[in-house]
Amino acid sequence: MANNLKRLDSYLVPGKHIHLIGIGGVSMRPLGLVLRGMGITVTGSDMNASVSTDELIAKGIEVHIGHRAENIQGADCIIRTAAAHNDNPEVAAARAQGIPVFERAAATSGLSLWAAAVRMMQSAP
């Protein structure tokens, strides 16, 4: 995990703001939709507009085309695609501001554990 001080699961709660770098990607788009469905404020950025980014915008997710430091304003944490390296302006700005940056793989793993816990709680007597 990119940030050992704070665990991602502490951000997977309604009312938090998570910014996704590369939100138009094949694994990031559904992640954004799931997070929004959980009551989390989701914003994101991608290098290019696409059918995926248009769908996210239509569903109420703020999408920025291009990567700029100001895109992360107000975010509690960042989830980045593997294609967004440390020199990405949003990653660099988050680190400079002390905003935790997590890898997409950690986010999907965290959500899988969260979903399993919910299922277990629902099936408990």
Residue ranges, per PLM feature:
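N-terminal leader/targeting and accessory segments in enzymes
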Residues: 1-104
